[in-house]
Amino acid sequence: MPSWRDPIIADLTAPGTRLLLAADPDDLLLDESVLRELQGHDITLLPFEDPIAFRTVYEERHRPGMDGNDGGDNAARLVVVVREDAAIDRLPYDLLRNGRRVSFGLAQIFPSLSYPVVRSLDHADLDALHMAYMRQPRAVGSHEPPVLGESATRDFLLRYVFDIDQSGIVDAEDLLAMLLRQHYGGRHLPAELATRLLEGLSRDARFDGWPLDHLLLDRRFCMRFLQERWPLFLDRLAVAGGAQLREPSVAYMEIPGPQALPFDQADVRPYIDSLFLDGLLQPVAYPHADDAIRTQGWVAVGIESDPAADRERRIARLLDALERELPAGDATYRAWLQYAPRWAELSVQWHLGSTPDAVGQRFHTLRARLDVAFLAWLEARYAGLYSQAALSPAMVHRIPPFLTMERQQLPQRPLALLVLDGMAMDQWAIVRDVLARQRPDLQLTEAATFAWIPTITPVSRQALFSGTMPRDFGATINSTSRDEAGWMRWWTEHGLPKDAISYQRSIRNAQDLDTLRQHLDAHQRRAVGLVADAIDGIAHGMKLGMAGMHSQVRQWAEGGFLADLLDLLLDRGYVVYLTADHGNVEAQGVGSPAEGAIADTQGQRVRIYPSEELRGTVQARFPGTIPWPSVGLPAGYVPLLAAARSAFVSTGEVIVAHGGCALEEVIVPFVTIERRTP
């Protein structure tokens, strides 16, 4: 079936003008597949945002040959991108004289649907929408289906994009299956679609008493709702198996709503298995386990038995899933963002203790496959990530633009960007579970994002706070003290006065919290940037490998510092966005290059050289090292990454480090934290 991308690609690759001026209000040109296709035709996109920065790049890299449009149909082309049609008229005269105007937008692709509603979708949902749109009947002589208003468009999207047919939700099984499809699949339901769905469900008397808004919008709340009702479901099975209950489990439920849920129904049960597997639901100690299992054997997945056996069983099931779901070479970046949290869950379980040899062999084999697959994917696709536009940022430098859009929606609500320096996804899984026990009223919206490679603080954290790519801060790329300047510059350029912006780093203890509290209480800050570096400090001092790392991170989280920091911010009305600048990985030493002063940066997982020639001399002595391309990096910044899970330290030494391109270093959490309203 044709794709919505086809007319865009056809227009941009048509023979003729080498310079095109494109209005792209919906960021369609930043779609991953569109970018890949354009790169295959040697077509470069150059956004026109800052006129001075644009002119510098244009003159240095693209101007030669553009004025005369010479070079033939197969010559490299440039697409200058602006946000709207009218902005093309404001481009410099030399571009207007030589360029051809084009325009692409969702309103052109889906003219029969309400544009504001369609625009709320993530680009990942456009394929499903286009397929459904093309299948709609047309009147004789018409190329488009009948026009739908806003409400009808919302219903259309709910049904055909999110597989939610409100008329088909008639009982608890239907409702629960719909909720589980959304939450387990990680689907983002736009706010106006969620509102439309809630309006319909709230009018249905069959769902009176269900906390529908929280169940639909808050995955963690939905999991707590299920967790509390799981023992009650086991009660019912145990009674059927002959047990006599002294005290029903319902007495311990806190979340309102129906007490009995149809966990065993055909559309629900497969999700329950997976939720226990992924750690979103926790097995419970149940006194009548034998009776419940006798009735329905599958419920054993949600009942504690022998802790060691439970752990081995869970590791085996995670291995089954991860072996099956390892992303292929043509996978989208979203596939890796979805894979990383499940790999993190396996890592947490794996490092809790020993396992049988056969299980260990499976783990190490899968990890080797993962390292090869992820590196191959990065080498092929990482270059297209930096400009991705999505409802959740694809890379850390896209976080400030994302926060700016969030602030436009709620301009009166202050925001805080909290960076837990060096926290990998597996460590977030530990911290998250501790937080859930300490502060059950927290509402966490979890996502993930890519760090910059090399995964070191001066590169990735500076990009994170400045909202720019490393090539734009080449003069300070070796500094760890420029985050505040980048953060201040971003927000002043986006409309905030300096006294409404704040930044504080190295937040570690109660005294630092007191300082922050006094600072926030004395000034009305609208955008606060914070760095807590305890986890990175643990990593750099770790001599016990990842098992020791996990143990100390758990101790740190249980100490309550992070919970207190979140309380401080949430009590003052902030919405908190928690992320990391990079992760970390357990690595084994292969020796340190005796390179004298030729390396500008001598890290444990990366060396930085001023030229490819100098890098090559070291690479020749360390087979398997990775000459990382300078994608998005400044000239004269040439990285050499350690191979796989190795490090440039004494041979055989085991450390926890970062700087390379392992999955655990590159993909980091991005979590929105709010306090759940009653």
Feature roles, as predicted:
Residues M1-L415, G422-V576, A580-P678:
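…; additionally, a secondary subgroup of soluble metalloenzymes is captured
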